[in-house]
Amino acid sequence: MIERRPFAGLGGANHGWLKAKHHFSFAGYYDPERMGWGNLRVWNDDEIAPKAGFPPHPHADMEIITYVRDGAITHKDSMGNTGRTEAGDVQVMSAGSGVRHSEYNQEDETTRIFQIWIQPATRGGSPSWGAKPFPKAERSGRFVTLASGFAGDDALPIRANARVMGATIKAGERVTLSLDPKRHAYLVPATGIVDVGSIRIEARDGAAITDLSTVQIAGIEDAEVVLVDAA
């Protein structure tokens, strides 16, 4: 099963400094049919104005992955971590028993991110944060694991039964991905257009995938795609 979730039909909010679209219920957007996909709870598509951002606020018991599409995001937290994550790179925060953090666009241009929340395998534990560059050339024509709850993956660690993956797919190129049909995959092109199986998925649309052992993704335009493989 592959279900297209068009960008135009997503929930969202415009706060002036923040233009947000929500693939799943979040804040003031509630849809009982879109409370998550497996243990994937949140996928927000955020545009953050220059010199603006999220002031310090708390989180607990959530794995929070930030994929930077354009610009850069600067993170500070109550553990003493500070980091600037640029376009194409990824940061992960395991909120654990509780943490406060802020995220600001300190650049002179709009920053665009995907923020993905995944429910952890166990509650509590010490919070942690990390970031890692993932050059787009290294994921050309194939999926690379960006964050993972599985030992042995060369990726940022998360405490969840899930993987976050990324690929760049050129127009005319096809990539085949093996899946567990009992799990839940969710794919979003950051840019470009792809066919997921026979379903056309445009930039910032979502594709909810389950009950399939393989899926073929074909580039219609050059595309940058992010996928979560969730329990």
Task: Name each model feature, range by range.
Residues 1-231:
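Jelly-roll (double-stranded beta-helix
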